[in-house]
Structures are given as structure tokens and as C-alpha cells.
Amino acid sequence: MVTDLEKEIVGLLKKGDKRAISIIYENYSSALYGVILKITINEEIAQDALQETFIKVWKNAKKYDSSKAKLFTWLFRIARNTAIDKLRSFNNKFG
């Protein structure tokens, strides 16, 4: 079931309204950061990955399809993939 908050966020994202990012950050950043930190095990990389996650969310906002995934699932996948990419990049540079 889609919540009113999710409907509001999706509506703002589809319109290109930057308030959507603020609302997402307020409501989901802690959970996304937790996911990212579990993958990266490094606070600096995790913070960088979280920031990049929000950039990707904004750039891909109009591609989000609520019939394919709930909003949090979509955000989670972006965060997870960004964390994995950041970790690979870090390991390639310093590993």
C-alpha cells in the first residue's frame, strides 16, 4: 500500500520539484545511510555514497515507476548499488 507521504514525494519528483529531495532526506536518509554503511564499513565512503545516492535519485526521478517497486525499494536499490560502486572504486585505488 502506498502511503500519502510516498504519493506526495512521487508527485514532486515527477514534477521536478526539489522539495522532494528534502522530504526524502528527512524521512529516509538514516535508513539509507545504515544500508550504505553496512556495505562500505567506512563512514567517509558511506557519507560520500549517501550524497551520490541523492544525486542519482534526483537525476533518475522521472524514471521511477511505482508499479514496479515501492519508493523505499527504489531508493534502497540506488543506495546499495552506489555503495557497492564506491567500495569497488575505493578498493581499486587503495586495495
Each model region followed by its residue ranges:
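N-terminal module of bacterial RNA polymerase sigma factors
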Residues: M1-A31
